[in-house]
């Protein structure tokens, strides 16, 4: 993964974002999720050995690795091991996790390893505040699931597969 023989291009030296999704399993059905309504919620997990190979191949990568996707990565049975592998001492990249925070209390020490932590919540502002007390350094985003399209304001595009609203253009 060093350099393309024809072009000389090396992805490792390019700033950017790599998204790692280690499970398709999620414990919520958030209306802002990119998963479609019929997306299967399956107990399938990336093997930690494959994850390790992927991470070590990125040893010289200098961008951001985003630990998020179409599942809640903290539900992976080897979440702690994956976080440890992701944060090996030789890494040059930054890490970010985006989570719904429902496993935060039990796994706080793993979440604290990330350079950027984003907690999404749509239950209530009170639940968000509870999570904020557990992990104050995280960015907490509250999404009101009951908000109607006419209340969205002038945002040009809204994507919300869970609520069956696709690409609303103002």
Predicted regions and their residues:
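Conserved alpha-helical substructure of the radical SAM core
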Residues: 1-113
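Radical SAM enzyme [4Fe-4S]-AdoMet core and its adjacent flexible, acidic
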Residues: 21, 41, 46, 64, ...
